[in-house]
Amino acid sequence: MAHPSLFIDALQYNNWSEEIFKQINQGGLSAVHVTICYHEDFQEMVQNVIDWNRRFEDYSNLIFLGRTAADVRKAQKEGRTAIFFGYQNCSPIEDNIGLVEVCHQLGARFMQLTYNNQSLLGTGCYEENDPGIKIGRAHV
């Protein structure tokens, strides 16, 4: 059933299950930004996408992969929830700036450039020194 108001969970990590998907659906969430990567490399992130693709098949009546803002309205209209992939770290791009586009093609819509530690894209809050960026300008 469609909900009259638009609700979006801007960041979520969970032990995903049918029960959780039912709860977010019953709560009227039209979209959820789901963390699928913390410190995983590219191959590990791809496995997470594979796992999510299985969930999209198994629970297609409740969730689907969101890629655009229009998918949020689609989810609201259909009474489902659009799942948007996000990364808490840029580790899946490893040292290959071309993987940014590949990650986007796989569904990533959010990528935190830095958090705690130094990455190729910037310096994290735990670093004592700021050595500068390596490929950050090209990424941005």
Can you say where each PLM-predicted feature lies in the sequence?
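N-terminal hydrophobic targeting/anchoring segments and the immediately downstream early-domain regions
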Residues: M1-K134
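Conserved small/polar residues in nucleotide/adenosyl-binding loops
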Residues: A138-V140
